[in-house]
Amino acid sequence: MNHFLKSIAKIYWHLLVSPEKEARHLGVKIGQDCLISTRNWSSEPYLITIGNHVQVTDNVSFHTHGGGNVIRRFEPNFDAFGKIEIQDWAYIGAWSHIMAGVTIGEGSLVAAGSVVTKSVPPGVVVGGNPARYICTTEDFFKRNLKYNVGRKLTRKEKKDFLLSMSEDQFIRKPYIKTNE
């Protein structure tokens, strides 16, 4: 019966409670006006601090420890942990992994799918595995400003608007360079 009740509770949290509310319940410290879409908070969520105006997108994973099992072969009682801090106005892209001891600096952007193994300075864009510097957020803003449609619309209004736009108003990425 206990397993059944735990299953019901898990379904309740995932269907009826927002990811942000669940994170706060688990002990994640979250600032004001954040958009939290993940539920992957490691086994020590109380070691994670998120500032104000932060966006953490789908399936981002936070890791407050790891690798201890290899060391336990030599030191059976080994365990090590690291706090994670996401500072104000940061953005963490979908499916990224934030490792123990990392700070994401104010106004920084972590590209989707990144593995962040070192702290990120304020105001930069990083991406990749492991995450590497791409550009400043100021450069990112300047490059993308021409694509700004400047609207907050309903789903239907957005669809109609986007389908009416010309091709040059959409973001287009260059091809990956090859050696051929």
Regions found by a protein language model. Name each.
Residues 91, 109, 125-126:
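Short-chain dehydrogenase/reductase
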Residues 16-17, 37-103, 130, 136-138:
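Flexible, glycine/small-residue-enriched loop-and-beta-strand segment within the central core
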Residues 118, 127, 133-134:
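HATPase_c (GHKL) ATP-binding subdomain of two-component histidine kinases
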Residues 94-110, 114-118:
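Beta-rich strand-turn-strand
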Residues 7, 79-93, 97, 131-180:
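C-terminal segments of enzyme domains that contribute to small-molecule binding surfaces
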Residues 32, 87-88, 103-106, 120-123:
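Structural motif
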Residues 1-25:
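Membrane-proximal basic amphipathic "stem/tether" segments
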Residues 5-7, 29-45:
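Short, charged, low-hydrophobicity "junction" segments
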